[in-house]
């Protein structure tokens, strides 16, 4: 693979492919273009009732884009249920560049001044590419996802790409679509303009359909 730059990374995402490392300690990256692509339809997002109680409790403080690299590094940490991750130093470096360009974004969950959950991704046009999430408290990553969807709906986004579908995401309505169907949705989203306003106050209820 040729040396990966932020510009090349943007062109890759715009064409429907994304990079991964086999492990966080491996320097090489490879391109991924799944036959079945995971998406989370913004118009059919489901918030489980039990999670709504957590959201209403306001036990967490939600911030955007205040600790982008810290979120990435937390997503790249090994955990009991995720002993290996694909986020290596090259990916972190490139996404930090995209963050500095205003294209990378993080949704962060804080509790008592401690970063306890969050997610990060990339915004292009009206498409948002969700990369990874982490949780150090019960429901923290789920709360981050709900707040992400609320912000995306508020900003006029059309596509939330999750790359793959996990059991964690299925409860929110994530689904797999064919590569061809994904390319159609991606093209439509890239042709439009949306706005990820990191400073806006957006209630989580905006995520509700």
Curated annotation (Swiss-Prot):
The gene it comes from is aat
* Protein keywords: Acyltransferase, Cytoplasm, Transferase
Q: What GO annotations for molecular function exist for this entry?
A: leucyl-tRNA--protein transferase activity
Alphabetical GO CC annotations of the entry are: cytoplasm
InterPro entries linked: Acyl_CoA_acyltransferase, Leu/Phe-tRNA_Trfase, Leu/Phe-tRNA_Trfase_C
Primary role: Functions in the N-end rule pathway of protein degradation where it conjugates Leu, Phe and, less efficiently, Met from aminoacyl-tRNAs to the N-termini of proteins containing an N-terminal arginine or lysine.
Enzyme Commission number(s) of this protein: 2.3.2.6
* Domain of life per record: Bacteria
Record's subcellular location: Cytoplasm
- One Pfam family in the UniProt entry: Leu_Phe_trans
Catalysed reactions listed for this entry: N-terminal L-lysyl-[protein] + L-leucyl-tRNA(Leu) = N-terminal L-leucyl-L-lysyl-[protein] + tRNA(Leu) + H(+); N-terminal L-arginyl-[protein] + L-leucyl-tRNA(Leu) = N-terminal L-leucyl-L-arginyl-[protein] + tRNA(Leu) + H(+); L-phenylalanyl-tRNA(Phe) + an N-terminal L-alpha-aminoacyl-[protein] = an N-terminal L-phenylalanyl-L-alpha-aminoacyl-[protein] + tRNA(Phe)
Q: What is the uppermost EC class here?
A: transferase
Similarity field: Belongs to the L/F-transferase family.
Q: Which residues form the signal peptide?
A: none
Kindly provide the name given to this protein in its UniProt entry: Leucyl/phenylalanyl-tRNA--protein transferase
Gene Ontology biological process terms in this record: protein catabolic process
Q: Does the keyword Acyltransferase apply?
A: yes
């Amino acid at each position: 693979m040729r040396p990966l730059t932020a510009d090349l990374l943007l062109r890759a995402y715009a064409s429907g492919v994304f990079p991964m490392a086999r492990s966080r300690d491996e320097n090489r990256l490879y391109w991924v273009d799944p036959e079945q692509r995971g998406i989370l339809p913004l118009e059919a997002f489901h918030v489980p009732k039990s999670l709504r109680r957590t959201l209403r409790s306001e036990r967490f403080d939600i911030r955007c884009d205040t600790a982008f690299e810290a979120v990435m590094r937390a997503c790249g940490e090994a955990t009991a249920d995720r002993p290996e991750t694909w986020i290596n130093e090259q990916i972190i470096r490139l996404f930090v560049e995209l963050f500095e360009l205003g294209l990378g974004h993080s949704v962060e969950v804080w509790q008592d001044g401690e970063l306890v959950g969050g997610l990060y991704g990339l915004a292009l046009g009206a498409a948002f590419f969700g990369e990874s999430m982490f949780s150090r408290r019960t429901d923290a990553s789920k709360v981050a996802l709900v707040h992400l969807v609320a912000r995306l709906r508020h900003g006029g986004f059309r596509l939330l790409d999750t790359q793959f579908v996990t059991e964690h995401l299925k409860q929110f309505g994530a689904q797999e679509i064919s590569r061809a169907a994904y390319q159609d949705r991606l093209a439509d989203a890239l042709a439009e303009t949306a706005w990820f306003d990191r400073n806006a106050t957006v209630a989580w209820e905006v995520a509700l359909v």
